């Protein structure tokens, strides 16, 4: 660039500027490449568990079940607002309403199995029930003696009605006609499903037979219940 004329203040001599243009090149230091990680949003944080189970008709399955962390805390907070002074049905419906749309990352495991395997309707119901039967039994340590469905998957343990409530949601998602059967006499909860089978372990409702299914422990088939709770007169449909 051209410099303007300068006056030498110590002499009377006029110093003319250089007419040659000078190019000044400024070299910037190379910047280090920094890879910034995008923070994980609350929508992307999960509790996850690899699961393995054997169906009651033979094949083994596996899958990654997960629930969003924010859904887990929502599940717990809703359940904590319930009390033992409510009816069982009131509490069950409350956790169902709060959690039923928060289980998509669990039901996706069953959707994959349904897509990949040519199972009958009876067999596919067993895939879901045997998955639940395989989750360890545990007594519940809260006021209403129930884990909400999302809470159940995260903790991966639960008691009888925790399991029947979870199955009620999931089986209905896949189009099964199910009810929850409770017995105050036996202090137990089992599933009732409207699928043809043999035997007399069923409750008749609205012209349909809902066959009992023991879902608390592994190995029980549709229509089977333990001998110590076999009297169907002591069972009632608590949720349909």
Predicted regions and their residues:
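A structural boundary/capping signal
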Residues: 1-240
């Amino acid at each position: 660039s051209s410099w303007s004329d300068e006056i030498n203040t110590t002499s009377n001599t006029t110093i003319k500027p250089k007419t040659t243009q000078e190019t000044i090149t400024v070299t910037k230091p190379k910047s280090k490449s920094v890879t910034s990680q995008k923070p994980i949003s609350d929508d992307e944080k999960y509790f996850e568990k690899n699961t393995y189970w054997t169906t009651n008709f033979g094949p083994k399955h596996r899958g990654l079940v997960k629930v969003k962390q924010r859904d887990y805390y929502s599940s717990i907070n809703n359940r904590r607002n319930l009390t033992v002074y409510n009816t069982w049905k009131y509490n069950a419906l409350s956790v169902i309403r709060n959690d039923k749309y928060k289980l998509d990352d669990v039901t996706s495991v069953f959707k994959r199995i349904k897509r990949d395997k040519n199972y009958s309707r009876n067999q596919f119901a067993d895939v879901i029930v045997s998955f639940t039967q395989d989750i360890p039994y545990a007594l519940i340590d809260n006021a209403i003696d129930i884990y909400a469905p999302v809470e159940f998957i995260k903790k991966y343990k639960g008691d009888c009605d925790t399991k029947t409530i979870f199955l009620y949601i999931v089986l209905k998602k896949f189009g099964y006609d199910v009810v929850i059967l409770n017995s105050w006499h036996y202090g137990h909860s089992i599933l009732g499903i409207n699928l043809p089978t043999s035997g007399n372990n069923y409750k008749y409702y609205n012209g349909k037979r809902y066959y009992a299914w023991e879902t608390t422990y592994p190995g029980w088939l549709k229509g089977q219940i333990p001998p110590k709770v076999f009297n169907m007169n002591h069972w009632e449909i608590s949720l349909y």
